[in-house]
Amino acid sequence: MDFQISAQQREMVASVRSLAQTEFKPNAMRWMDGTFPWENMKKLADLGVLGMSVPEEYGGLGLPILDTALILEEIAKVDYVTAMAVLGEAGVQTRVIARYAPASIRERILPQVVSGDCILAVCMTEPHAGTDVANYRTNARIVGDRVILKGTKTLISRAPEAGMFVVFTRVDGKPGREGIGCVLLEAGTPGFAVTGTYHTMGGENLHEIQFDDCELPLENLVIREDGFRKLLTAFNTQRCLNPSISLGLAEGAFDEAVNYVRERTIFNKPISDFQGIRWKLADMFKDIEAARGLLYRACLTANPFPDPFMAAAAKIFCN
């Protein structure tokens, strides 16, 4: 398998690296209170980064998963909160809309994703079920040409900022995995509310949201049949992109460690001269490179979604 990074990939990564190192890194702590990094997202939109997963016909770059992972990795080296915000625009929710939504929704929403005017949120976790989709209670009831959505989702990223929510739900109360589908809900829909906020150690805020008989057009039910398989297939993308952020965090920590051991002195010499310290750095480097190889290999299996076994292995090791 060829892990060579192309000149085009290097150029894009270099542009993002320059922006991240000069503008994101000095201000990364600003977002640790849960504030959404709108300022950074606008700059990334100007570079085209928010359209990485959007097909070219809607103004995006249509990048392969490896390219997307490389860019997320670069941002995460210096700014975890911004990297997670970008993941929301490049991950499973964008790909569900691009692949399964009707043309009318794709044509309206995807260009706004590219420009940064529409933030996306994926809604999976429920208070009693976690991500165990077979036990979802949120339900989309079909009534004529409308869909009535009722239920609760929790630990949702970007809920106050999002313009559209990709909601995995039961359809017409059908039990088990076979009853899982997906609806698209726009912010401001009557009956929708953000009802709780949980601040995390990483700086992100996560939220609980309620759907109280939200009425939607039937075309917003974008996955009705075989939703569980389609969900897991699409989610394998997330299992590659999320680890790319973990890899970036590890690289950022390694860079800081190397700089520190060169500057910190004991007995009039830098601690980098001590063999015990070098062993620690060698172990860090080894783990980072092993993670990189596993992750890049998983990304390269995408057609259009990554191999589930490789994606799972990469996520376990990197995270």
Model-predicted segments: where are they?
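Alpha-helical interface subdomain recognition
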Residues: 1-79, 88, 100-105, 112-117, ...
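Short Ser/Thr-interspersed hydrophobic loop/turn segments at strand-loop and sheet-helix junctions
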Residues: 48, 72-76, 169, 185-189, ...
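Flexible, glycine-rich active-site loops centered on histidine and acidic residues
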Residues: 94-100, 122, 134
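A short, Trp-centered hydrophobic/proline-enriched beta-strand micro-motif
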Residues: 116-124
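Active-site-adjacent elements of ketosynthase-type condensing enzymes
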Residues: 128-136
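Glycine-rich phosphate/pyrophosphate-binding beta-alpha loops
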Residues: 129, 154-159, 200-201, 238-241
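Flexible, small-/acidic-enriched active-site or ligand-binding loops
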Residues: 135-137, 188-221
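A short core secondary-structure module
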Residues: 146-193
